[in-house]
Amino acid sequence: MAMGKYSRVDGKKSSGYGLTITIVLIVSLCLVGAWMFMSSWSAPTESIDFSANERTKDVDTTKSDFKSEEVDRGSKSFPDEKNEETEVVTETNEEKTDPEKSGEENSGEKTESAEERKEFDDKNGDGDRKNGDGEKDTESESDETKQKEKTQLEESSEENKSEDSNGTEENAGESEENTEKKSEENAGETEESTEKSKDVFPAGDQAEITKESSTGSGAWSTQLVESQNEKKAQVSSIKWKVCNVTAGPDYIPCLDNWQAIRKLHSTKHYEHRERHCPEESPRCLVSLPEGYKRSIKWPKSREKIWYTNIPHTKLAEVKGHQNWVKMSGEYLTFPGGGTQFKNGALHYIDFLQESYPDIAWGNRTRVILDVGCGVASFGGYLFDRDVLALSFAPKDEHEAQVQFALERGIPAMSNVMGTKRLPFPGSVFDLIHCARCRVPWHIEGGKLLLELNRALRPGGFFVWSATPVYRKTEEDVGIWKAMSKLTKAMCWELMTIKKDELNEVGAAIYQKPMSNKCYNERSQNEPPLCKDSDDQNAAWNVPLEACIHKVTEDSSKRGAVWPESWPERVETVPQWLDSQEGVYGKPAQEDFTADHERWKTIVSKSYLNGMGIDWSYVRNVMDMRAVYGGFAAALKDLKLWVMNVVPIDSPDTLPIIYERGLFGIYHDWCESFSTYPRTYDLLHADHLFSSLKKRCNLVGVMAEVDRILRPQGTFIVRDDMETIGEIEKMVKSMKWNVRMTHSKDGEGLLSVQKSWWRPTEAETIQSAIA
């Protein structure tokens, strides 16, 4: 536009004057050109396109990170924690001073003209067209494809750099070191070509990427820098603090709500041991016990655990003579005894089998409930008989007893038979066991025993090993008479009473009826039959009622027929699913089979071999949204157990899980789970969080995930990509190690490992101050 103005003036001036102006302009342009050339030659690294180079660095970094994760996952050592902001600065500095990259770029610039540097190499033979200004008009189709595939890499390059404490660190307070050197160490390595790597991290053509046109970013920001800054802002907006609570490292939010407990009018029915969740889920992280170490592997953990992990000795002092637990140097040891089996649980287990062979451990009897479990040695040794025992006891009835059980690798939970139903469906347990469980079954119309009747499968057994069975004191005789009257009115048949001479105890074995004949022939309707409108499967926060649910006699419905023997039962499609529609829209039986095959494939081809999980450390597993229990079924041959959780707003598939010989529980993930901190080695969530975020605060849910997962434990999430992104930001803010990300068709997979990191600041939870 300026030259156009001068041309209009030229017609009014003399030719000599115009020549002078022309010479001045030419000289000026030459000087400017020389200055630009000298600047470019003297500092070649400054002319490198930061944006293009950043993208190249991103892809290289992600490739090397992915190779490290996929090939070297067996290593037990993981990168230390690293501050995210420092990470970005380091990356930028490395790019600007990388001699290899600088050399390649500079040599290319010296041999090409300015016009040639703006062109894109015709690597694929398609050619590039330019418009009148010399700019590229269209890119090759192959490069457009690479740019789309590269989007995931550019967004996750920073996040794929590990931010975890050392994987071999055993104590929480150790110093953290910066070990992030993956990109430099792996630069130039050849990517292994596998189907998974193509789906997750497409390789791209590095040579082609580095020859892209170098258009200086100047004062303009790049999308990569903007995205990195936004991610840092979002992550830093979550400022984690340690929970300052009376329970310290043993904090269970819904069981340590002292504000609610102090307001109770009565504790006669153990109301103070029931769940009282705070109005808002805590968003702080529970502290670690001083000297906490990684849990001992199963099966050694059944015999001993680290004292520093659960530094409680009261139970050893009170119950040591009954071989519950003893102190032994740096360990707490468990001789395998109990109040009713001082000489070992296995002898007691075999005694029960001999007393009534129809029990058939691990065949007919697969899933049992152990009430008032002590330290759960009974359930721990039933694994040797292929039996799953879910043990429960009130929190702190005996100091840390449930916590001991879980640390040993034995299924257990904090719960109480108080005023509400147990969080299980009706008619699911093959056997229920009570060994000196201190529950007054006979009082208040037998309300508590009737709750067991609800949970017990028709034809199932109730094993009562308590002093009224074999002692003749006045109190014991009175309880026995009351119990006999109640069980007869409930139509339970006393199958046998046997005495264990070695342990000097006895057991009475009852069986629940498989028909309603006895109920209909009773002379008195006491206890009364439940109303037809009373759903025996309704269990979440439902008050107890002293009534009997009729058993199902229709063979096409659940409960009328005993399940297949174990292990066939885990793969057998329940007959009663025939007339129902499945969760995924197909006929239920077809749905069940497809789900079973799907999880077998996922577990065998991905989880067991492709994620770098050391399964020898995995004992306590939770499926946070279980559906049919396919995930747990696929893991049945491993030496572990799975707590299957069916959220209260999901289809009620928990009875199907029990039918398969597995167990589980109902739960609302907007509240804390009734377990101690650091009790699970692996948490699995399949499309849980996308539904939770509609009604829960995900920060509170993730604080709960952190609470129940052990340091160095694994967290696997499958969900839509938006939700995966949110979860990834949160785990990164807690310094967890992102081990793997995968995306396809809008769905994502995230695998992370919890670190040892704890915040330095504290947050007082007023409801948890005693």
Swiss-Prot record:
Coiled-coil ranges (or none): none
Taxonomic superkingdom: Eukaryota
Biased composition (Basic and acidic residues): 54-81, 93-164
Transmembrane segments: 18-38
Subcellular location field: Golgi apparatus membrane
Principal localisation: Golgi
Membrane topology of the entry: Single-pass type II membrane protein
Any GO MF annotation of the entry: methyltransferase activity
Keywords on record: Glycoprotein, Golgi apparatus, Membrane, Methyltransferase, Signal-anchor, Transferase, Transmembrane, Transmembrane helix
Polar residues compositional bias, start-end: 212-223
Cytoplasmic side: 1-17
Disordered: annotated segments: 54-223
Identification of the protein by name: Probable methyltransferase PMT24
UniProt organism field: Arabidopsis thaliana (Mouse-ear cress)
